[in-house]
Each structure stands twice: as structure tokens, then as C-alpha cells.
Amino acid sequence: MTSCGGGSGESSNSTTETTSKEEVKADPKGIGEFKSVEIGEGIDETLAASGKAIVDMKCTACHQLNDKRLVGPGFQGITSRREPEWIMNMITNVDVMLDNDPQAQALLEECLTRMPNQNISGPDARGILEFLRKKRPRKRWNLDSVKINNPDLNFIK
């Protein structure tokens, strides 16, 4: 007798296989040619204007500049939620991003429609990014949550 197992009488020649998928960690820069994008402090108005023209021509049929979903998600706040490289990779490499990037796949799951490849070049994608940066919402004061301890300043509310 060469077995040391329990007395069930059944033999097992199978090996234990793990069927769970390895969790893929999303690269915050996405997948594509853009690994590093230089962004200045201010807005390049010329670049933003060229980006606006492209957005008006190729993007507004599906995307709005607010936070509302049309076909695709609204653009509001995108530059706060995503890295510049991710945005540019999504614009220029949309098919690979939708197939392999977990963040892009989550958007596809939410919107249920694949973003079409618009054949946007790297320089044009940079213009779109600059336009989206220009549209970034400014932080606003919420005076309802501010407590003013000086009675002479209560007129502010």
C-alpha cells in the first residue's frame, strides 16, 4: 500500500488549478504612446482654441462639457480625475484602451457604447487636453458652510 490518505478508496491524479484571474492594476497613465506629458501652470490659449475646434467637430455628438452623460461621459472634471497621459492615450489609442485598461473598461460598462476611433493625432490630442484643462471647474466658496464669528461681517451671507 503506497497511499497515506483517508480511506475513501478514491484516487485523485488531478492537480489543483486556480481559476481566478489575476487582478490587473490600472496604470494611471493608460496604455499608449504617451508616457509623459509636459503641462505648464497656465493655459496655452492657442493650443486650447485648436482643441476646442476638434472637440466641436469630433466629440460633442457624444460628450458634453458638463458632468452629464450623453452617449459618453461628460467632460467636466476629467482633468481632475485622470492623468494627462491617460486622457491623451484614450483619445489616440481608444481601441487598445477599451480592450485593456480597467478604467476605460469601467466607462464602457457604464456607457454601453464603444468610443469610436476618431484618428486624432498626438498634437491634436494635446490641444483637446489643453481645452479640457481650460474648462476645469474653479473651486467655489460655499458660504452656507462658513461660520462668521464677527457680527460686523454677517452681511456677507
Q: Where are the language model's segments positioned?
A:
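Gly/Gly-Pro-rich "capping" loops immediately C-terminal to redox-active cysteine motifs
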Residues: 48, 52, 63-93
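Sequence context of c-type cytochrome heme-c attachment sites
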Residues: 35, 64, 105-106
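Electrostatic cytochrome c docking/interface patches
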Residues: 16-54, 155-156
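Axial heme c-ligation environment in periplasmic c-type cytochrome domains
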Residues: 6, 70-78, 95-124, 140-141
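C-terminal capping alpha-helices of c-type cytochrome domains
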Residues: 85-90, 113-150
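C-terminal motif of bacterial Sec signal peptides marking the signal peptidase cleavage site
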Residues: 2-3
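Sec/Tat-exported extracytoplasmic proteins
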Residues: 58, 63-66, 79, 91-95, ...
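Bacterial Sec signal peptide processing site at the extreme N-terminus
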Residues: 6-18
